[in-house]
């Protein structure tokens, strides 16, 4: 691995090394940021223990958990199934961060609940683009990732 490549991994390594938030709620700083942020940045852990690339995703936060969608065969989904913790930065790559427990859910009702929130937060979702679709969840083309505090 080259020095520049390693430098890009250092923030993710620091989060992996951090102590997870205890209890059943997010830390106050993360909770506040989740209520106003338009996106989160997420990463997982590879089989070799190294952090994956960190990517921005749109999300819904209901005060208890974070929800976002991904493809069932995506690297994120496969690593979550394998038990990888989810590394989360809120709002920006240097924003509040934590390690979360992620699970895949396949409930079209959750996608239906997410859609109006996406419409409110993201103008392009209001047009029908990139919005959670219950039918795609029902057909297995999309899965929902639920993220809870802790690892």
Which ranges hold each PLM region?
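Hydrophobic alpha-helical segments typical of transmembrane helices
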Residues: 26-29, 55, 76, 114
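Short, P/G- and charge-enriched loop/turn segments at secondary-structure junctions
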Residues: 28-30, 45-46, 130-135
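Hydrophobic h-region of N-terminal signal peptides that target proteins for export
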Residues: 13-24
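Short beta-strand segments
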Residues: 37-72, 86-89, 97-101
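Bacterial N-terminal signal peptides that target proteins for export
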Residues: 1-13
């Amino acid at each position: 691995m080259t020095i520049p490549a390693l430098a890009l991994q250092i923030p993710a390594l620091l989060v992996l090394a951090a102590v997870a938030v205890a209890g059943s709620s997010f830390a106050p700083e993360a909770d506040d940021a989740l209520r106003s942020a338009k996106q989160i940045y997420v990463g997982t852990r590879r089989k070799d223990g190294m952090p994956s690339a960190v990517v921005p995703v749109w999300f819904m936060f209901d005060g208890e958990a974070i929800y976002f969608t991904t493809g069932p065969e995506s690297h994120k989904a496969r690593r979550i199934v394998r038990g990888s913790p989810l590394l989360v930065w809120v709002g920006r790559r240097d924003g509040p961060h934590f390690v979360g427990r992620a699970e895949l859910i396949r409930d079209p009702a959750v996608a239906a609940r997410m859609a109006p929130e996406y419409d409110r937060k993201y103008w392009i979702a209001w047009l029908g683009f990139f919005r959670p679709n219950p039918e795609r969840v029902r057909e297995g083309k999309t899965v929902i990732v639920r993220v809870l505090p802790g690892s």
